[in-house]
């Protein structure tokens, strides 16, 4: 029979729509503005007393508190107004001190039964939630030049060790230049370098009677250095962003040499730039002898709080400036280890310090500039007030203490670690002492929370007006079939929101534009179908046959048009940046949902209403 679906197909469509309604429902529950409290270190746990103290301080400061709670992640205080978030953060930070991290957050109000089903609202982009956007550019040329200088030092150290006489020449065209007065020295140097430095292309040349050895990095090694630099800077930036106490920050790579940092809720760009640009370092020191004088030792805490403090010698062997690489791996027995590489000068210093101290322990001290807030009295508008002044304090902690098994050089390894997790963390900390390459701020943008809320309101208005005008147009043109298309359009919006929520896609202002565009594209499919039905009726077909042929013959055109649009969406996503990607994601998901609602859902409703009935005329 024409225009009839089997029962299973109706049930399948109902099931898909039900899932759509369930997973789009969390977006009906707006998040509460909140401040989140956690310990600055894993050893410090937030207690209910801390939360109560913070809540009381907020109430005393005239900031309305909606509710508070305590979980394994820390304390959460919900506020009534979003504009109170920044003042609340300052009050709580001042009340609890620098031992606690106070972060701006948005607390979900989704009912428990929806959360158990995995339902959560869409994430909002920076243009809708407010915050700071930075685009950092990594100077890759400086990264290559710095690594080349390290290799130059190592090559010269090798030649001096093997007593090969050479003349030092300046680096030229990304290549180390070495001059020799005789071919015998050149050949010996070439053989030594080729043996110990496999990542170099060694080419002999002759210039003005001087024999020159040109030592250049291979293209593969250059690519490896650039990749390492961007990854290392990405890791360091992530570590520094964590100190800002921001809920759900975004730190991701963009292109070959750029890093995007988005900090929702942050309005103080100066503080964010200070944190991102701050420095950390490392020190390698020998553990103090039991009979050492107190004046010659210094005691340090471990980064791991369960271990007791250890006295170390005041003399520093090398610093993190000499560490060129650190990576986690496994030894020949499958045990975790950390491989460390030093520059030429660092290797000499390390060898000098360890060759007579085999059997003693050596510690790696991590030095970090921690942000603290101090309060000073200042005159503000003729009134003396306490004003927060951001500052940094130096914190030194031991991250590794290992026994020296043999004299060390510019390459050595740390073993005796508890597991691969500890080796990975140690390697990360050894690399986090600084940036692998200089960075500068290529772009900076601040979006206030009120502007974000205004963008949301305007986006909702645009979507509603768009849906209203599209619905009126299609109802006027196609009458009762226009009503069916409008219902399908509403289902399409529900399905699109549900799909974005399930996938965890971020909704941005261009994404809202994609939603409005999706409405027109969804109705476009209905227009093709209904126009085809009109044509078949005009050609003298019966009502049932016209409906059947209208849907079937329009399908190919709809599929071709939507596949072409999906291809464009894919290209936009692959080639575009943040805002363009947001638009591409929403548009592409909207195309998928519109094909389902315009073809399957609309057909199901038409079949239920008109299928199997003897209609002489259609309201189309």
Curated annotation (Swiss-Prot):
The chain crosses the membrane at residues 10-30, 464-484, 488-507, 511-533, 555-575, 582-602. It is a multi-pass membrane protein. SUPFAM superfamilies: Multidrug efflux transporter AcrB transmembrane domain. InterPro entries: SecD, SecD-TM, SecD/SecF_arch_bac, SecD/SecF_CS, SecD_1st, SecD_SecF_C, SecD_SecF_C_bact, SecDF_P1_head. One of its GO terms (biological process) is protein transport. Keywords: Cell inner membrane, Cell membrane, Membrane, Protein transport, Translocation, Transmembrane, Transmembrane helix, Transport. It comes from the Bacteria. It is found in: Cell inner membrane. GO terms for molecular function: protein-transporting ATPase activity. GO terms for cellular component: plasma membrane. Part of the Sec protein translocase complex. Interacts with the SecYEG preprotein conducting channel. SecDF uses the proton motive force (PMF) to complete protein translocation after the ATP-dependent function of SecA. Forms a complex with SecF. Part of the essential Sec protein translocation apparatus which comprises SecA, SecYEG and auxiliary proteins SecDF-YajC and YidC. Belongs to the SecD/SecF family. SecD subfamily. This is Protein translocase subunit SecD. It comes from Pseudomonas aeruginosa (strain ATCC 15692 / DSM 22644 / CIP 104116 / JCM 14847 / LMG 12228 / 1C / PRS 101 / PAO1). The lineage of its organism: Bacteria, Pseudomonadati, Pseudomonadota, Gammaproteobacteria, Pseudomonadales. The gene is secD.
């Amino acid at each position: 029979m024409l225009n009839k679906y089997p029962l299973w197909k109706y049930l399948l469509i109902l099931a898909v729509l039900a899932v759509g309604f369930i997973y789009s429902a969390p977006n009906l529950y707006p998040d509460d503005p909140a401040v989140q409290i956690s310990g600055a270190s894993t050893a410090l746990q937030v207690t209910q007393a801390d939360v109560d103290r913070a809540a009381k301080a907020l109430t005393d400061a005239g900031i309305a508190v909606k509710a508070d709670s305590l979980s394994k992640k820390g304390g959460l205080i919900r506020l009534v107004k979003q504009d109170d978030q920044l003042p609340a953060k300052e009050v709580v930070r001042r009340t609890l001190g620098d031992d606690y991290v106070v972060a701006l957050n948005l607390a979900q109000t989704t009912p428990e039964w929806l959360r158990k089903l995995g339902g959560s609202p869409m994430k909002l982009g920076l243009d809708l939630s407010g915050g700071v956007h930075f685009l950092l550019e990594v100077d890759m040329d400086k990264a290559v030049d710095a690594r080349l200088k390290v290799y130059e030092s190592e090559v010269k150290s090798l030649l001096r060790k093997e007593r090969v006489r050479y003349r030092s020449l300046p680096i030229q065209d990304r290549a180390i230049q070495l001059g020799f007065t005789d071919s015998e020295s050149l050949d010996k140097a070439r053989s030594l370098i080729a043996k110990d430095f496999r990542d170099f292309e060694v080419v002999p040349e002759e210039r003005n009677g001087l024999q020159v050895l040109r030592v250049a990095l291979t293209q593969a090694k250059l690519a490896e250095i650039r990749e390492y630099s961007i990854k290392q800077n990405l890791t360091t930036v992530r570590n520094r962003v964590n100190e800002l106490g921001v809920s759900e920050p975004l730190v991701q790579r963009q292109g070959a040499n750029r890093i995007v940092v988005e900090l929702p809720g942050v309005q103080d760009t100066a503080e964010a730039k200070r944190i991102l640009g701050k420095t950390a370092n490392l020190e390698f020191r020998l553990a103090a002898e039991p009979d050492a004088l107190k004046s010659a030792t210094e005691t340090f805490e471990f980064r791991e709080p369960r271990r007791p403090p250890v006295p170390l010698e005041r003399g520093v062997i090398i610093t993190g400036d000499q560490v060129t690489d650190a990576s986690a791996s496994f030894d020949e027995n499958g045990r975790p280890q950390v491989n460390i590489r030093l520059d030429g000068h660092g290797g000499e210093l390390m060898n000098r310090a360890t060759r007579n101290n085999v059997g003693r322990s050596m510690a790696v001290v991590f030095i970090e500039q921690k942000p603290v807030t101090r309060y000073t009295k200042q005159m503000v508008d003729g009134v003396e007030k306490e004003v927060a002044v951001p500052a940094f304090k130096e914190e030194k902690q031991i991250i590794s203490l290992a026994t020296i098994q043999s004299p060390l050089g510019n390459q050595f390894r740390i073993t005796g670690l508890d597991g691969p997790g500890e080796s990975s963390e140690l390697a990360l900390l050894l690399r986090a002492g600084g940036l692998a390459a200089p960075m500068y701020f290529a772009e900076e943008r601040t979006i206030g929370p009120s502007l974000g809320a205004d963008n949301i309101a305007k986006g909702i208005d645009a979507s509603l007006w768009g849906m209203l005008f599209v619905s009126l147009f299609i109802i006027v043109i196609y009458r009762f079939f226009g009503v069916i298309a409008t219902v399908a359009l509403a289902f399409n919006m529900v399905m699109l929101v549900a799909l974005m929520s399930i996938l965890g896609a971020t909704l941005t202002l261009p994404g809202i534009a994609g939603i409005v565009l999706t409405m027109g594209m969804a109705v476009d499919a209905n227009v093709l179908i209904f126009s085809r039905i009109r044509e078949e009726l005009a050609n003298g077909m019966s009502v049932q046959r016209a409906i059947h042929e209208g849907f079937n013959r329009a399908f190919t055109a709809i599929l071709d048009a939507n596949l072409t649009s999906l291809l464009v969406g894919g290209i936009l996503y692959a080639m575009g940046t943040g805002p363009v990607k947001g638009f591409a994601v929403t548009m592409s998901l909207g195309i998928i949902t519109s094909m389902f609602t315009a073809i399957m859902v609309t057909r199901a409703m038409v079949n239920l209403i008109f299928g199997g009935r003897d209609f002489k005329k259609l309201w189309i």
